[in-house]
Amino acid sequence: MIIEDFEALKHWLSKTLEPICDADPSALAKYVLALVKKDKSDRELNALCIDQLDVFLQKETQGFVDKLFDAINTKSYLPQPDSTSTAVVKLDSFEHQEKEIKKDEVNKEEEKEKKAPRRLNQSPQPSSTRHKDTRENRKRSNSDRESNSIQNSFRSGLPEQKQDVDAAPPRLNSNKVQNAKNTRSRDDRKRDDRFRKREYDRNVPRRDSYRDRYNRRRGRSRSYSRSRSRSWSKERQRDRDRSRSRTRSRDKDSGKPKFDLDRPDPVDNSYASGSSVPHIGSAHFPVPTLSSTITVITPSHHGNSSAENWPEFHEDQVDHSSYGRLQMQKKRCRDYDEKGFCMRGDMCPFDHGSDPVVVEDVNLPGILPFPAPPPVLEGPPPPGLPPPPSLLTPPPVNLQPPPVPPPGPLPPSLPPVTGPPPPLPPLQPAGMDAPPNSATSSVPTVVTTGILHPPPVPPSSLFPSAAAAAGPIPLFPETYEADGYNPEAPSMTTTSRPLYRHRVHAQRPNLIGLTSGDMDLPTPREKNNMRIVVDSESRKRNLGSGDCVLPSKKPWFDKSNFNNRMNPGFQKKPLFPNENTKLELRRIPPELNNISKLNEHFSKFGTIVNLQVAYKGDPEGALIQFATHGEAKKAISSTEAVLNNRFIRMYWHREGSSQQLQTPGLPKVVHLTVPQQPNLSVMKQSIKERLGPVPANNSEPSVAQNINTETTQNIAKVPVKERLGYMSKTVSAATEKVFSTSTGLTKTVYNPAALKAMQKSVLYPICNDNGDAQKKKQEALKLQQDVRKKKQEILEKRIETQKILISKLEKNKNMKSEDKAEILKTLETLTNSITKLRDELKAVSSTGNVVKNNKSKAQMQKELLDTELDLYNKIQAGDDVTELRKKYTELQLDAAKRGILSSGRGRGVHLRGRGVIRGRGRVLHGRGRGASVHAVVDHRPRALKISGFTEGDREYLLPHFAHFGEIEDCQIDDSSLHAIITFKTRAEAEAAAVHGAQFKGQDLKLAWNKPVPNASSTEVEDADQEEEEFHEDSIVDDSLLQDDDEEEEDDNESRSWRR
């Protein structure tokens, strides 16, 4: 069936089904719509609908289906357009509403006008004409506001005429609305603005960005200019009204309560000019002591101000980076990505990702310093800056005081309490926009006045340890400059702050997981955007002569790399010298990692001097050296994929890169070469650990012990290579005590992933030496192999010549005696040389075997574990592992033969208690108290013949049986698919026979493999066995009797341990 509008039909169906059906009408409407959509004839659809809907509608089914098909055919389900009539009705109702609202507003204004003379009794020259003008203005504003509300409601009532935000509203034909719109005055618009601002201040959480407000104000100012240009007489009238109302508002403000100044009266319709700011600034307001310095939002929040109030507030003073978060995405921080940390911390203008680790490190060496604040006099603001908004408005009333810290001893890292806390430093000037930062401060927005008043001294009961702290001689000089009050590290001093010193962020220390996307940092420093950062170094406490925990540091400015743009800690690029000609390849598939393939690809870029496959023992690595740097650069900058494989990585090869990566600015994790400089472990501390009372001097060793234990726990897991003794030197990690204070502004952001890479490079600087040694070994082996090949060739040639000479002698029997003697002499020398060469070759091969056999158990185990790890990683990555699995099986067999795959890795047979396993007269005792077992040669078979496994399971067979004991030998026949595994002892072979039959869900066929002995040896063995059996039985009987005596003695002993 043809349906024009599915949504309309669905709406009609749900409306029709609601009275006749108990089910959900909307769901049933969807179901009916699905039935009607089917590609069938009308008759079939009718029958189908009746059949399917009978369950839901029962008696109403036939009527509903007829009605449905009739509606679809006649299209009566489509909505009928009757917008013109509804519009007319709505317009009439709006006009009626407008009259009622106008009456109410006029009554309210008259009541306010009666009250106005009482408040204006201090004005110098009240006049009746002024009241008349203001009444006329109010009436005009009321009519204008009502016309606006009519337009808005009319626009929302017509869905067909929805328009964009920037589009003009639809024009009404009503003369009344048009006249009201034309007569709208600037004063009434300003009152609307103030009303909107007041609503904005009440709903603080839903604050929009400064740009939105600024654009909105600009849009309104454009409309003002349009309306202003329409009439010269209106402009003159407006100027007269403005001058009158300005004097009236000044008088009115003087009589207001002090906290109502930021809420202007509705009748105030004037703009405060820039010249009026200093007069208002003379008012004094009490400053509540709050817990942190806060940033001011914008001057547009305050009642008496708007964009025109601030003549010095220009576009170029606004820091667009702080609020234009969508206009340009931040670039990634190079230091954070490459080195693993950024010493600028949350003051870095670049992106540190979604979850950086932020650590407060005021006293850490290598932190990027910031210049000390310039000397500032307490007085008016700098000439370039507009007056701070703190001179205009007092703090909002709705703020609550900060939480008081609990009573208890102060941390010793804080200075002694000698007076009341310093007043809050003033905040950012009005020209700088800083939105509220929920990630960095937990205190609500505060505006403070510019005049410093010492706040009242807090009650001494809150800080009982204040007197005790001030009692002894202070360790720190009085020049220490205290920070603003911080509830997490409270401190009180009498030193006051300079008036116009601004803090960019007031952050709690050691915040972990700060999102740098939430930090809106002002990056470009333009004309009057002055950012003064306090140097944390100047506020550090200087230790006394008696305390020698921290060494005296060299000042930042004396260091050679201070403020040096060529500092290697902040290089933009890793510098590769122009003479570098080596390229390193990684992730090459093993089948492509051969000399011919690599030479074929890289020879097109230039002359290859050296080519190494399986570089540094990595089967997927290679090293290629070109003749010149240009050729290497051409190869690395080529867009063509290496061997047509995009997964192959190519790098510049750097000699000794692991030592070069460590820079002076790095927090050194482990030092192998310079043990004098202590390393710093990155520790996560809780708030209690940071703020809790630290014991005095006598507890320093215990603190150092705790730090040592934490360091050992925090060091990354020891890799397999190091566990197996691969590292020749032990890593000694010294720790340094770090005193963390909350007064610093610098924070270091750590990137754990990059730091791991750095730790690897620092932990293994010996790898280069090992690589050189391996190179030398490989070269020596190559030479040996070449010599051996040449000797083999010489040997073969001499054997051939010997054969030729012998055949010549046999054929030419009538040869002369002289020739025959010469040939015999030559044959003799040939045989001597051949035997000599054979001996030499045997010696070389035997020494090679000795070297192979001399592999230590640890090396074998390391190699096996490395291969197992590579196999696991490749299986996880989905790569081809056939070659690697073969190598792993060979290593397993070799390890099993040497007894490395011992029973300790799996289930073994353990004897305990008083059980006896007896066979052929031999007894193994397993008494719980460790009685010695008599060792006897066991001639029973230790080899198992295994069959019944598939070809795919052949590789896993050896590891399966290696769990039961040490394997001496393993022979797997590929053709008949049976294996013979020989265990070291009979007991292990029996355990494998009992428990090893189940393999991968199938039963293996196991049998003892008995070797066929010689007849002579069997007779001798039988005789020996008889003697052994007789001798052993007597020994066993004696030992058994002895054990019985011991048991009797045990029975007589006291059983106190059993209770």
From Swiss-Prot:
Organism, scientific name: Xenopus laevis (African clawed frog)
Region annotation Disordered: where it falls in the sequence: 98-275, 375-443, 1010-1059
Residues of the RRM domain: 581-655, 942-1011
Matching SUPFAM superfamilies: CCCH zinc finger, RNA-binding domain, RBD
Basic and acidic residues bias locations: 98-114, 130-147, 184-213, 232-266
Name of the protein: RNA-binding protein 26
Compositionally skewed regions (Pro residues) per UniProt: 375-428
Record GO cellular component, one term: nucleus
Biased composition (Low complexity): 434-443
Acidic residues bias spans: 1019-1031, 1040-1052
C3H1-type zinc finger locations on the chain: 327-355
PROSITE patterns: RRM, ZF_C3H1
Basic residues bias: start-end ranges: 214-231
Coiled coil: 771-873
Keyword line: Coiled coil, Metal-binding, Repeat, RNA-binding, Zinc, Zinc-finger
